[in-house]
């Protein structure tokens, strides 16, 4: 017999779920819901525990690769057994719209002074090709002198070099403000900074390699091609942080700067020596990835401050690998981020509340924990809330209030087996829907989170 599904669209979805599951004190479980999210471009779906829930849930995002069957990570943070039949799990789902932000990760920095004690490299063949608003540089650098640096990860070599390229007959104003690396002959070489001083183009590069996996050493010469483009950026990074920070056009994926073996007594952190400048138009929001045994902090990243991700282990012998994905950085309009505090709390402790404004602009908190939950699953809307109702979600520890206009509706799909549906027919997305009852939560192994950001 063919399965039937209900498909609906909503700005906010509250899950209020019961199950014959008993959580021991401090126990963590991952529960598969059977709920699907239909793929939508430029949509960033998040889940956060409602402040009325006795059971904690991890504040995280739902990767598009995991949308086929949404999995919830839950924890009993009390010192007594917690029965999900008596104390429902309450989680709020919502989605940010991620516009295409012109983020320049490798800007051309104009400098007035340079240290002149560098000895020129043996040979540097360079060709500049001008294409109107673009300039292409093809170069072959020989006999590179690398300087060894201390890598944060002991199993990695790290070397740095700086080479100077004479612009020859190329006018300096043809070296535009944004650089895009089209290829480098060595895959372990990354360009960190590009500077322009009078008629000299200075490129700072790094080479890093895991000597346990690859015995190759740094190259003595490299070929590369860089395209210089004139652009009006929304956000400019101070320096390129590849391979541990990569931008896909909508958000930055943040990876670990070292291998980490968990210690349950002390927090540990990864530091990224870069900052961003948006002329005070944007602020970053770091949302952690679910990693079994590790809790990461969630925080807002203010411009012109260095990025630091702090973690705490709640299990022994958990491992995070170098460049393993830690979370995502999305950029929000700076007027949303009004609180001065930047490093906030860990993913397990963040809570949320849904706020509703009535016609008189009086704000009330949507309190669903006060209503009993039937065992049979029900999908419904909330009375008196329409498409015109002002609804927002508050992330309590982050001090962020996110209005509906900064969010996008999400399309969900659920099998209709034993599911009673009370959704009015409308051409517009619903503002707030509630899925409650026993939907057949299944315990599954928690993901290790071991996903390399460059895989």
Curated annotation (Swiss-Prot):
Superkingdom field: Viruses
Q: Which family does it belong to?
A: Belongs to the herpesviridae UL82 family.
Question: Mind telling me what this protein is named?
Answer: Protein U54
Under Pfam families, the record lists:
Herpes_UL82_83
Originating species: Human herpesvirus 7 (strain JI)
């Amino acid at each position: 017999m063919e399965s039937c599904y209900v498909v609906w669209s909503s700005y906010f979805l509250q899950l209020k779920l019961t199950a014959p599951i008993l959580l021991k004190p401090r126990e963590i479980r991952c529960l598969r819901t059977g709920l699907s999210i239909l793929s939508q471009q430029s949509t960033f779906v998040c889940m956060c525990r409602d402040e009325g829930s006795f059971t904690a849930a991890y504040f995280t995002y739902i990767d598009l690769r995991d949308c086929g069957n949404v999995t919830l990570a839950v924890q009993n943070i009390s010192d007594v057994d917690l029965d999900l039949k008596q104390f429902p799990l309450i989680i709020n789902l919502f989605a940010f719209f991620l516009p295409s932000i012109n983020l320049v990760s490798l800007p051309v920095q104009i400098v007035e002074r340079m240290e002149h004690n560098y000895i020129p490299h043996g040979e540097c063949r360079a060709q500049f090709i001008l294409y109107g608003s673009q300039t292409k540089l093809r170069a072959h650098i020989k006999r590179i002198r690398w300087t060894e640096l201390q890598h944060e990860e002991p199993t990695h070599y790290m070397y740095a070099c700086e080479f100077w390229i004479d612009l020859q007959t190329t006018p300096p104003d043809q070296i535009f403000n944004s650089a895009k690396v089209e290829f480098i002959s060595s895959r372990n070489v990354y360009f960190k900074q590009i500077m322009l001083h009078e008629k000299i183009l200075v490129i700072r590069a790094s080479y890093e390699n895991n000597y346990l996996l690859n015995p190759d050493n740094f190259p003595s010469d490299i070929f590369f091609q860089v395209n210089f483009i004139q652009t009006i950026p929304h956000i400019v990074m101070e320096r390129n942080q590849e391979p541990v920070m990569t931008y896909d056009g909508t958000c930055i994926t943040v990876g670990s700067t070292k291998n980490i073996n968990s210690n349950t007594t002390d927090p540990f952190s990864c530091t990224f020596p870069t900052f961003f400048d948006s002329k005070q138009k944007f602020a970053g929001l770091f949302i952690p990835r679910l990693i079994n045994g590790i809790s990461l902090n969630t925080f807002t990243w203010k411009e012109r401050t260095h990025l630091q991700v702090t973690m705490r282990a709640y299990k022994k012998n958990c491992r995070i690998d170098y460049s393993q994905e830690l979370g995502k950085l999305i950029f929000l309009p700076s007027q949303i981020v009004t609180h001065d505090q930047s490093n906030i709390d860990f993913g397990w402790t963040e809570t949320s509340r849904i706020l509703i404004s009535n016609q008189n602009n009086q704000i009330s908190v949507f309190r669903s924990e006060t209503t009993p939950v039937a065992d049979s699953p029900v999908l419904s809307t909330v009375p008196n809330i329409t498409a015109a109702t002002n609804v927002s979600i508050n992330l309590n520890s982050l001090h962020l209030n996110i209005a509906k206009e900064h969010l996008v509706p999400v399309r969900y799909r659920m099998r209709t087996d034993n599911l009673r549906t009370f959704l009015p027919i409308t051409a517009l997305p619903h503002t707030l829907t509630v899925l409650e009852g026993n939907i057949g939560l299944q315990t599954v192994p928690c993901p290790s989170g071991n996903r390399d950001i460059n895989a």
